[in-house]
C-alpha cells in the first residue's frame, strides 16, 4: 500500500472534521464571525496541520474571531485527533485565507462598474495618434 498520498487524505479528513466542530460552535465569545475552512495541508510526517480559514464579517469581527480560533487551537487539535483516531496529535496552525474576501471585493467592484456603465454613457474617446478612424478600419 502506498503512503505518499496519506498526508493529503489526512488533511482532507482533518478539514472535514474541523469544519463539523466549528459548525457546532465554540464557547469562546470572540468567535462571532462565520468561519469557513477553505483548505488544509498536512506535513509529510503528520505533525503539522495548516488550516486555511475564511471569516465573514467586518475587520474587527475577523480579527476577534481569528484570535478566538488561535486560542482554541489546542482544544480543536484534541477534538479532531480524537475523532480521527490519530496516533499523534498534529500541531494546528490557522492561516487567514483572503481569497474569498478578495473574490467578494472583485465581484462588488464589477457590479459597481456595470451599474455605473448603465447609468452614464461611455465618454467619447479619440483615436490614438496614428490610428485609423473607424470608417477606414472597416474597409
UniProtKB/Swiss-Prot annotation:
SUPFAM superfamilies given in the database record: Ribosome-binding factor A, RbfA (SSF89919)
Keywords of this entry: Cytoplasm, Ribosome biogenesis
Transmembrane helix in keyword set: no
One GO-annotated biological process of the protein: maturation of SSU-rRNA
Domain of life: Bacteria
Biased composition (Low complexity): 119-132
GO molecular function, one term: ribosomal small subunit binding
Gene3D superfamilies documented for this protein: 3.30.300.20
Subcellular location(s) of the protein: Cytoplasm
Any one GO cellular component localisation term in the record: cytosol
Annotated region described as Disordered, given as residue ranges: 112-139
Function: One of several proteins that assist in the late maturation steps of the functional core of the 30S ribosomal subunit. Associates with free 30S ribosomal subunits (but not with 30S subunits that are part of 70S ribosomes or polysomes). Required for efficient processing of 16S rRNA. May interact with the 5'-terminal helix region of 16S rRNA.
Subunit-structure text: Monomer. Binds 30S ribosomal subunits, but not 50S ribosomal subunits or 70S ribosomes.
Family: Belongs to the RbfA family.
Protein name per its UniProtKB record: Ribosome-binding factor A
Organism: Anaeromyxobacter dehalogenans (strain 2CP-1 / ATCC BAA-258)
Gene: rbfA
Amino acid at each position: 500500500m502506498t503512503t505518499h498520498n496519506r498526508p493529503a487524505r489526512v488533511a482532507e479528513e482533518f478539514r472535514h472534521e474541523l469544519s463539523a466542530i466549528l459548525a457546532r460552535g465554540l464557547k469562546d465569545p470572540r468567535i462571532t464571525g462565520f468561519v469557513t475552512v477553505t483548505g488544509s495541508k498536512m506535513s509529510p510526517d503528520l505533525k503539522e496541520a495548516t488550516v486555511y480559514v475564511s471569516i465573514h464579517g467586518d475587520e474587527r469581527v475577523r480579527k476577534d474571531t481569528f484570535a478566538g480560533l488561535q486560542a482554541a487551537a489546542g482544544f480543536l487539535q484534541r477534538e479532531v485527533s480524537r475523532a480521527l483516531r490519530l496516533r499523534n496529535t498534529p500541531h494546528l496552525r490557522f492561516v487567514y485565507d483572503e481569497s474569498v474576501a478578495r473574490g467578494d471585493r472583485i465581484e462588488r467592484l464589477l457590479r459597481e462598474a456595470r451599474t455605473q456603465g448603465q447609468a452614464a454613457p461611455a465618454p467619447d474617446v479619440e483615436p490614438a495618434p496614428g490610428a485609423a478612424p473607424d470608417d477606414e478600419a472597416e474597409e
